[in-house]
Amino acid sequence: MKKLEEYVRSIPDFPEEGIIFRDVTSVLQDKDSLKMSIDQMQENLNGLDFDVIVGPESRGFIFGVPIAYNLNKAFIPVRKKGKLPCETVEMEYALEYGTATIEMHKDSIKPGQKVVIIDDLIATGGTIEAITKLIEQLGGEVVKIVFLMELEGLMGREKLKGYDIASVIKYAGK
């Protein structure tokens, strides 16, 4: 059987020269690698005491929901601004060129809840840093962050010091 990283399609010079784009869609398009990715991410939660899983739009949904289902936990979506219908809390964060804003329902995290964040990729860490701030603003405690892939050269872990982070696949470059 192939190793999970063998299913990840690497596209050189995309979106710009010198970058190797790691394409998660090739993992999703194969039933074996999809199962393997969810199982391996979920293994990082064995024995962990937590209440809910949080995942950002959209690929955090893809991996977070099946793990939440498997572990009988609730799933809390983090969306782009303007996509949630009830009262929200929001956080703006820096992008390479400009800013973005994410939000969660104000009643989605209860004070004292232990939270796991699931996403497909950590690059610079900006999105996840903003999510941790939202969770903590609502009174939650981030007890683990799990990624399918990590681009170590972009130093995303530096923004998330103090958090327990696990990545299934690590790439040395950007």
Curated annotation (Swiss-Prot):
GO terms for cellular component: cytoplasm. Keywords: Cytoplasm, Glycosyltransferase, Purine salvage, Transferase. Pfam families: Pribosyltran (PF00156). Gene3D superfamilies: 3.40.50.2020. It catalyses: AMP + diphosphate = 5-phospho-alpha-D-ribose 1-diphosphate + adenine. InterPro entries: Ade_phspho_trans, PRibTrfase_dom, PRTase-like, UPRTase/APRTase. Its main location: cytoplasm. CDD domains: PRTases_typeI. Pathway: Purine metabolism; AMP biosynthesis via salvage pathway; AMP from adenine: step 1/1. It is an enzyme of class 2 (transferase). Belongs to the purine/pyrimidine phosphoribosyltransferase family. Homodimer. Catalyzes a salvage reaction resulting in the formation of AMP, that is energically less costly than de novo synthesis. This is Adenine phosphoribosyltransferase. It comes from Lachnoclostridium phytofermentans (strain ATCC 700394 / DSM 18823 / ISDg). The lineage of its organism: Bacteria, Bacillati, Bacillota, Clostridia, Lachnospirales. The gene is apt.
